[in-house]
Amino acid sequence: MAASDVLVVAGTHGNELNAPWLLEQWNRQPDLINSAGLSIQRLVGNPQAKAAMRRYVDRDLNRSFRVDLLEQSGGDLEMRRARELLGRYGPRGDEPCSVVLDLHSTTAAMGCSLVLYGRRPADLALAALVQSALGLPIYLHESDSAQTGFLVERWPCGLVVEVGPVPQGVLEARIVRQTRLAIEACFEALASVRSGVVRLPRQVVVHRHLGSCDVPRGESDQPQALVHQRLQGRDWVPFKPLDAIFEAADGSTVETPQMEHQSIPVFINEAAYAEKHIAFSLTRREVWTMEPQWLDHLSELLS
């Protein structure tokens, strides 16, 4: 089978409905999304979880792409699905794709944002071009041994598109629209790189992952407090000294270690992260100068 430029994956988590619905409409209306002349493969990442309206069946598919799991035989449904996707669409698959876009929604007030895992040059180039076009924030997730095995890491270039807030299992026009615009911006950026007419921004702004924070818990591991009402919904807003972080059931502020000044919380109170004991993650805003070799790496993938 012929190679394709881009693999678009929706429904990696089965209770995130907006991106899969958009792909269904795109299948029915091929002109709905401008592919900018690129060859595209599109699919639902975890159809069994989607049918069950659950994030996953046995384990999180978006943590099932670790090398040690991929090298095993058999295993849980999501482990088998990860191997299936790589075997068909991975760089050495039957229908290899150079770039993967993994489409997600979140219950957190993240707006429309991009997520990178590590500092691969091609990823940085694509994210910088999309940020230049749409102004989207970039969350750079790295150096966190507790969170690994992400789908996009197994392709030569990959971005996660996160859009929220929206409850799990709910379709919302705003989320679909923002997802569609982000997809088209990615396609346009890739097409411009291939054509050689791309204009690189001089800088890219990233929010680099520092770590994650859980709510206070008691001896039984049950939450003893919750995200403070003044913090809820303030993703991307820097912490200030003495900001309240958690509150008790009576509304009183719970004493917590002071957050690093100007650290920036993201994925605040994301529903799916409660099982991972993550109330929010912390980032630091950094401005990086664009490196010419980033674009070279992306251009080589599309040649």
UniProtKB/Swiss-Prot annotation:
GO molecular-function terms, A-Z: aspartoacylase activity; hydrolase activity, acting on ester bonds; zinc ion binding
**What cofactors does the UniProt entry give for this protein?**
Zn(2+)
The EC class name is: hydrolase
Q: What SUPFAM superfamilies does the record point to?
A: Zn-dependent exopeptidases
**Transmembrane segments annotated in the record for this chain:** none
Enzyme Commission numbers on file: 3.5.1.15
Instruction: List the record's Gene Ontology CC terms alphabetically.
Output: cytosol
Q: Which UniProt keywords apply?
A: Hydrolase, Metal-binding, Zinc
Residues engaged in binding substrate: R55, N62, R63, E162, Y273
Database matches in InterPro entries: AspA/AstE_fam (IPR050178), Aspartoacylase (IPR016708), AstE_AspA_cat (IPR055438), Aste_AspA_hybrid_dom (IPR007036)
Query: For Zn(2+), which residues are the binding ones?
Result: H13, E16, H104
Query: What does it catalyze?
Result: an N-acyl-L-aspartate + H2O = a carboxylate + L-aspartate
Pfam families given for it? AstE_AspA_cat (PF24827), AstE_AspA_hybrid (PF04952)
Q: At the top level of its lineage, which domain of life is listed?
A: Bacteria
Write down how the cofactor binds this protein. Binds 1 zinc ion per subunit.
PANTHER family xref list: ASPARTOACYLASE, SUCCINYLGLUTAMATE DESUCCINYLASE
The family note in this entry says: Belongs to the AspA/AstE family. Aspartoacylase subfamily.
Listed name of the protein: Probable aspartoacylase
